[in-house]
Curated annotation (Swiss-Prot):
Probable gustatory receptor which mediates acceptance or avoidance behavior, depending on its substrates. Atypical expression also suggests nongustatory roles in the nervous system and tissues involved in proprioception, hygroreception, and other sensory modalities. It is also possible that it has chemosensory roles in the detection of internal ligands. Glycans are attached at N82, N438. It comes from Drosophila melanogaster (Fruit fly). Keywords: Cell membrane, Glycoprotein, Membrane, Receptor, Transducer, Transmembrane, Transmembrane helix. It is found in: Cell membrane. Residues 1-47, 109-138, 193-292, 351-407 are cytoplasmic. One of its GO terms (biological process) is monoatomic ion transmembrane transport. Its main location: membrane. One of its GO terms (molecular function) is ligand-gated monoatomic ion channel activity. Residues 69-87, 160-171, 314-329, 425-450 are extracellular. It is a multi-pass membrane protein. The keyword Lipoprotein does not apply. This is Putative gustatory receptor 28a. Belongs to the insect chemoreceptor superfamily. Gustatory receptor (GR) family. Gr2a subfamily.
Amino acid sequence: MAFKLWERFSQADNVFQALRPLTFISLLGLAPFRLNLNPRKEVQTSKFSFFAGIVHFLFFVLCFGISVKEGDSIIGYFFQTNITRFSDGTLRLTGILAMSTIFGFAMFKRQRLVSIIQNNIVVDEIFVRLGMKLDYRRILLSSFLISLGMLLFNVIYLCVSYSLLVSATISPSFVTFTTFALPHINISLMVFKFLCTTDLARSRFSMLNEILQDILDAHIEQLSALELSPMHSVVNHRRYSHRLRNLISTPMKRYSVTSVIRLNPEYAIKQVSNIHNLLCDICQTIEEYFTYPLLGIIAISFLFILFDDFYILEAILNPKRLDVFEADEFFAFFLMQLIWYIVIIVLIVEGSSRTILHSSYTAAIVHKILNITDDPELRDRLFRLSLQLSHRKVLFTAAGLFRLDRTLIFTITGAATCYLIILIQFRFTHHMDDTSSNSTNNLHSIHLGD
């Protein structure tokens, strides 16, 4: 019975079924669209999800307002200093701005998310004309594993965080802990949505590269170009040894799914140009839809990483601020929070970097084909595609301020280290001023006593 249920759930023959995990978050209002499995296969906005998003955001604002009015915060339960009060206020401000941006773009820019899915459907139809079909089941399982992993990650994180607070004899109110938990949940859902959409683009870039690689393999076989470097196989280098053995013995078998591509490469290159153009439009729409929410998420993640590091160093440098019984819980709580935000940034960076990496393979394969073929019509198509590749490059940014690639990790590390040193210097300067003030008051008291 369980096996049949799993087989039924894991079945995916189109992009709609592959996006089932993404539609689950529509109940929270962060994906206000619905998929119609009718013959027309339409993607429509959902009024229910739009209403759920408004209710969700108003509930967060209510909890946030009550916690601010009562002056409760998680860090305030441990210790209070001028810097912690400043950091707490900064995190509150960035938190409400980030949540407003996330819900605002999710609800009022939802048509862009719908256009992303619709353009993916058009791309899949072009692939079918070329005799290719995406592995929708793999996409479904990939998104399902990502959603399950993020769900378990957040459940464990929030449960352990609450347990650490309770074990430290801290009992946060429902409003305070809800204000703490909801941003984590919403950030995770937005990042999950970003990973799903970038994976849709990445998988299609990968399929596009396979088409070009098949054209390249066909030319290598026809010309018996054994002198070419094994690196000519861009999609999968291991295929070269198998291709070499076939060239020595018998030609490689041409499968029916690639017959259109090999028999009419000019038509295939023309369709590849159309697919690449649509994929660039998809990636541009992804950037426009996620640019400000991701900017808010990265900004608040950077601040949490910075201040969590400072809290831990503050407790190490001045252990008297913490009771002996709550010191272990303090370190564990803020270390877990630090790791959580680092994981979020890594997921964003990897989701965009993998898509950019697969899109960059296309230009390499195109120029490898140009170096081999002498067909004037095919070369003309390839030159046009090469020009398109040079002008339409995939790039993800956060409102154009910085790129969402692996260089962002190095940038955040350097900036956090710099500001952490400044905070430590400010802390020591403030501590020295307090010490000198106390010494002056003591000397003045002694002088008056005399």
